[in-house]
Amino acid sequence: MEVQLFPSGQLGDETEMIQNVRAGNLDIAVVGIANTVPFVKKLGILTMPYLFDDMYDVVRATTGPAHDLLNGYAIREGGFRILGWTYTDYRYISNSRKPIKNLNDIKGLKFRVPQSAILLACYKAWGANPVPISWAETFTALQQGLVDGQCYGYITFLACKFNEVQKYITEVHYTYQLQPMILSQRAFRKMSPEMQTLITDAGRDAQEYCLAFQLVEGVRARQRLIESGVQIDQLEDEADWRSAAISQVWPEMETFVGGRAAINAFLSAIGKKPWK
């Protein structure tokens, strides 16, 4: 098998890539989980705020019964398979204005967010002003002051040089950014059984490598950002952020992600109590 790589949006934005994967015009793509939701709304469960308590929950959500559950949704509803997952850290909050240490500090600030109904609702629940802006335009929007901040993990923050226009980061653990490696179901059906096994195993190996890379390089990127002058703060009141997000966003987005039964099926798959 020969694999050709087309990085940096050469094949269009993520929505276009997902459409091409579904149509069989593109074999594999790595996309942000939020961009899969218009095609498989139950995958939006992964973006519900404070779904995960820690990295153990994140790993359980992307392996074993939980992965099988989500992959089944993707195959039946989306026309693609989830070969594996890439891990890009919590969506920590950065801004250019001031340190954010409590819920009151974020009120009124404008944040770039992806086109995600759940993230939009989450920031509104905290009293911030979320603005959907494409990823390609994020740096310019920050540089020109169109928004005060954004949300992403340390490796991406450093690679995109956001530290040139953002001086404050707050470690808020409300959502973990996952990017599934999706494979066209049409392409998969054309493969021999041996090739299907080979590519499935390769996806699992890539996922394990990505997790190990993230755990090590995320720490290094954090330190490099501190050395570059970025101030990193922890919240004084994350329980209040959690309460605001869960009490407002979960009921509002229940139907959007497939209903309470789907949410509780996923919670059961990662060993959590049902949402009542």
Located regions from the model:
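N-terminal secretory/targeting leader peptides
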Residues: 1-57, 65-66, 72-276
